Amino acid sequence: MSNAITMGIFWHLIGAASAACFYAPFKKVKKWSWETMWSVGGIVSWIILPWAISALLLPNFWAYYSSFSLSTLLPVFLFGAMWGIGNINYGLTMRYLGMSMGIGIAIGITLIVGTLMTPIINGNFDVLISTEGGRMTLLGVLVALIGVGIVTRAGQLKERKMGIKAEEFNLKKGLVLAVMCGIFSAGMSFAMNAAKPMYEAAAALGVDPLYVALPSYVVIMGGGAIINLGFCFIRLAKVKDLSLKVDFSLEKPLIIHNVLLSALGGLMWYLQFFFYAWGHARIPAQYDYISWMLHMSFYVLCGGIVGLVLKEWNNAGRRPVTVLSLGCVVIIVAANIVGIGMAN
């Protein structure tokens, strides 16, 4: 396995670790509605950081974006909005299926759809079937899916042992939402694929290869921001128990505390795709669709590890932890299989 591929896998791991940890600061926010907290974090992660970093990278910010036709920018934006819809459905999936089953089904579907639909859209799916390296990477995707399934099973065993149940368990409604969440969340993968002309334009301006994907986030995350922030603002305006004014009428130190923690959560959310861009830049072009598989499977891996570190599994018993460990090992094996396949 080449050093470039190894580093690509490593940066995807770092990005996924940030994704697995990003919600920790949000849990420390006090006396704010979820909608206010999520909006503040989202403004940082989907608007401020993409714009600020792009302004630093590009020699002429406005000239860069105005150089693209609507036919180039619109798919990128709409796929970003598609991801935003999936993101909203994510919480509802947890509500009706419970954390473990909801995450397992949603992540499993978005892993498959986001990984395999990209080469199909690009018309090079035959690379997966007709070449040794392609077949090896396809095997890695399958093994990763098995790993996600094992980790999901571990979560179910943990919830059963600890008496944790879904807020309003409804299998039919939950499955529909999980499938929708999985498909729509893959919009981020499609958006990045559609943004390739933006990568090329950034490279032509002298932007370092590690950073060429970052300017596209202004458009991608802009689409997602409209959906997420729109959802939050509508709820803040219509739901009687929610009030932005009340949330910002608390004691000043508490407001500052909440803003800083929400901003930190937003920063950590953004960093997952900052390092995704670094990892993606190291992956061979013919296997660039594998970036999504690496990110999603490592997200599940890191989520399990973070749960162990935070002692969330302490009262779960030995069997769930053993199953979780097995799932993590399978995901690591999958990453190595994919790496070997790309090297071939």
From Swiss-Prot:
Uptake of L-rhamnose across the cytoplasmic membrane with the concomitant transport of protons into the cell (symport system). Keywords: Cell inner membrane, Cell membrane, Membrane, Sugar transport, Symport, Transmembrane, Transmembrane helix, Transport. The chain crosses the membrane at residues 4-24, 38-58, 68-88, 101-121, 137-157, 175-195, 214-234, 259-279, 290-310, 323-343. It comes from Shigella dysenteriae serotype 1 (strain Sd197). It catalyses: L-rhamnopyranose(in) + H(+)(in) = L-rhamnopyranose(out) + H(+)(out). GO terms for cellular component: plasma membrane. Signal peptide: none annotated. GO terms for molecular function: rhamnose transmembrane transporter activity; symporter activity. It comes from the Bacteria. It is found in: Cell inner membrane. Its main location: membrane. The keyword Transport applies. It is a multi-pass membrane protein. Belongs to the L-rhamnose transporter (TC 2.A.7.6) family. InterPro entries: L-rhamnose-proton_sym_RhaT (IPR004673). This is L-rhamnose-proton symporter. Pfam families: RhaT. The keyword DNA damage does not apply.
